[in-house]
Design a protein with these regions (language model features):
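Carbohydrate-active enzymes and regulators
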Residues: 1-200
Length: 200
């Protein structure tokens, strides 16, 4: 192996593929667990990921490359105008709680306060439309976005009804195409579960 490296021989490729999914479970009640789950993921995962990728384009435009699968249900949550409006209130509630901590806990909260404020500023800069930032990264060539089964259904269990499997995949492809104006380059199989003859 060392000889191969010193002779500059091509050894292969490494692909980093992230999988992003949340179920589309909505409740009308205020402060529902499902909304909290989505907002926390936006705060701690999706905004930071988009920001790091945007920064990588500035620093090394030719070297930045990543693949992510965005499930149709997660995309639908990103597209929800109601959730886009609720996120600032959700994060401001947490900021107020951090500001009310006793003095001896203040040092620990400063990092969280700054992080939450930064993420909220980013959210507001783009009017809560994080999905458009993913589109920007896709169009820039630094990010490949693939799809997943429409409802993240476990396909090996669904194979008894082939129409269901086909429906899951075709619906996901249509949803991806209508969102990003391109067909997905691939699909992430839910739970990485494959069965023989799954190829469609």
């Amino acid at each position: 192996m060392k000889d191969n490296l010193t002779n500059n021989k091509f050894l292969g490729n490494l692909a980093f593929i992230l999988h992003a999914h949340l179920p589309y479970v909505r409740k009308n009640e205020k402060n529902s667990l499902e909304e909290d789950w989505f907002f926390q993921a936006v705060l701690e995962c999706y905004i930071p990921l988009v920001r790091v990728l945007e920064e990588s384009i500035k620093l090394e435009p030719d070297n930045a490359k990543l693949t992510i699968s965005l499930s149709p249900t997660l995309i639908s949550l990103f597209q929800s105008a109601e959730l886009q409006m609720k996120f600032p209130e959700w994060i401001n509630t947490r900021i107020k709680l951090l500001e009310e901590l006793p003095e001896k806990q203040r040092n620990a909260s400063q990092f969280l306060l700054k992080n939450m404020s930064d993420q909220l500023n980013y959210w507001e800069k783009y009017s809560g439309n994080i999905l458009n930032r993913f589109k920007y990264l896709l169009d820039s060539g630094c990010l490949d976005i693939i799809t997943c089964a429409a409802t993240h259904g476990y396909l090996p269990i669904l194979r008894e009804n082939p129409e269901t499997v086909i429906g899951q995949i075709k619906t996901a492809v249509r949803h991806h195409q209508s969102t990003f104006n391109v067909k997905p380059l691939g699909i992430w199989l839910p739970e990485c579960a494959y069965y023989e003859n799954l190829d469609i």
